[in-house]
């Protein structure tokens, strides 16, 4: 049998406006561990991402086996209008949380706002789970998933 072409998901990436603030949220607030920081110069950024004239300051944070790459482009590219989770090609990062209300408050202090209200699933494998999407002040989406507390 031939080996698979893809063996793993290496990381999820999120472009942020302020890497230092993002690290406070993801590490101090959400409990991720800083694995490394790095910088991509103008040439490497253009070659790998197609974005010309920008430098990337980045950090990789981990939680268990999962890696999130936080990327700050300098200069940043701001959208003219906000995106939507329904926009084709839009991606989000889903986080399993133990205290949804506390994480909502923490994220709000870093510019993340709910796009709806927490919804409690009523059936299926996620019955009792509370779920909500958040949008970053400058774009991007997080999904918070709070399973019911086990006895």
Question: Residues of each region from the PLM?
Answer:
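Vicinal oxygen chelate
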Residues: 1-5, 9-17, 37, 58-70, 81-107, 129-135, ...
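Short, glycine/acidic-enriched loop or turn micro-motifs at the edges of active sites
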Residues: 21, 72, 146
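Core segments of cupin and vicinal oxygen chelate
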Residues: 15-65, 102-103, 109, 115, ...
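Long, hydrophobic N-terminal alpha-helical segment
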Residues: 2, 8-11, 30-31
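Short, tandemly repeated low-complexity microdomains enriched for cysteine and small residues
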Residues: 37-40, 72, 80-84, 119
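A generic structural micro-feature
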Residues: 4-6, 50-53, 84-87, 126
């Amino acid at each position: 049998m031939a080996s698979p072409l893809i063996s793993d998901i290496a990381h999820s990436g999120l472009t942020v406006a302020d890497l230092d603030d993002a690290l406070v949220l993801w590490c101090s607030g959400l409990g991720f561990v800083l694995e490394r920081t790095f910088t991509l110069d103008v040439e490497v950024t253009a070659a790998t991402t197609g974005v010309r004239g920008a430098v990337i300051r980045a950090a990789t944070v981990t939680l268990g086996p999962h890696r999130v790459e936080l990327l700050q482009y300098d200069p940043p590219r701001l959208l003219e209008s906000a995106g939507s989770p329904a926009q084709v090609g839009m991606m989000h990062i889903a986080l399993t949380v133990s205290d949804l209300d506390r994480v909502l408050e923490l994220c709000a202090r870093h510019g993340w706002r709910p796009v709806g209200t927490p919804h409690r699933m009523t059936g299926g494998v996620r019955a009792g789970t509370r779920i909500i999407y958040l949008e970053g002040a400058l774009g991007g989406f997080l999904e918070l998933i709070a399973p019911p507390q086990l006895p």
